[in-house]
């Protein structure tokens, strides 16, 4: 599963999967996803998918 993210600095887009994500945070109305040393803004339409990414990062819904 890949999610389209927008770079914080120049607005360029990138596609990442859960294996590449090292963290997710919420600031005001914006969701940031951290990949390597870069922060990416999640497009509004992808927020539900980021929830799935977080679950995948944390070993799935069931442990």
Model-derived features: where do they sit?
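Eukaryotic intrinsically disordered, low-complexity regulatory linkers and tails enriched in Ser/Thr/Pro
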Residues: 1-63
């Amino acid at each position: 599963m890949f999610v389209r993210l927008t770079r914080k600095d120049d607005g360029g887009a990138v596609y990442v999967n859960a294996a590449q994500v090292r963290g997710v945070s919420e600031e005001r109305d914006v969701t940031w996803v951290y990949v390597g040393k870069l922060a990416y803004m999640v497009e509004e339409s992808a927020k539900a998918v980021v929830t799935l990414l977080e679950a995948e990062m944390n070993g799935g819904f069931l442990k």
